[in-house]
Amino acid sequence: MGKWKPESLPQKIGYRGWSTLGMLGLLVLYPLTVLGFATRYYASKLDSTRTRLGVVGVTALALVVWGALTVAWWALSTMEQLDIPFDAFLAVAAASGVATLSTALAASAKKFGGRLMTVVFAYPFAMTALFLPPVVAALVTPELEAYVLEPSYDLAVWVLDNILFVGGINEWLRATFELEGAAYAAMWAGISFPLGWFLGIVVALANLVRPSE
């Protein structure tokens, strides 16, 4: 059998068009689908914990862990031997509250919502709950700053210079906010939403290709 070759102009246009779409699908959709399969696998591991403990159990566990951290940091801030600003305690308390609430909302959206609710709410709130612990740990542990806060600062500079330069957004952010203390937690909470939506979309793409059982 010989290879078919387009002869007329419409055939040539259609042939080139479909080949271009196929190439784009191979270069773009295939890697995204593979990423979706990987994300779905690890998300299922986290979801199994939510299934065993339930929404109330997961929320209670997060409340105990984050509450213990907040109380411990408050106790340290009251010691005269340690120079810990009260603002640092408030930053830890606020991040603890956000992380606990995010855990509860992610678990609730996954349990009671459909696919749309999972993409719109569950993944972003789950990312927030995952991102905040290392950031808060770095805020209260100076030894971790070089591993968490300094790379976060470099990432913020890169995003401002290469993505948010449109319309002078980067200049406004630099003039309005200062990246220190609780601002690191706010930064990662902001990143978690677009990243969560992206991961939710690639998982939905993977489900279209091969639905999960």
Question: PLM ranges: what are they?
Answer:
Residues Y30-S44, A182-S212:
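Transmembrane alpha-helical segments in integral membrane proteins
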Residues S96-A104, P194-L195, L199-I201:
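Hydrophobic core segments of alpha-helical transmembrane domains
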Residues N162-L195:
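Hydrophobic alpha-helical transmembrane segments
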Residues M1-T100:
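Transmembrane alpha-helical insertion/packing segments
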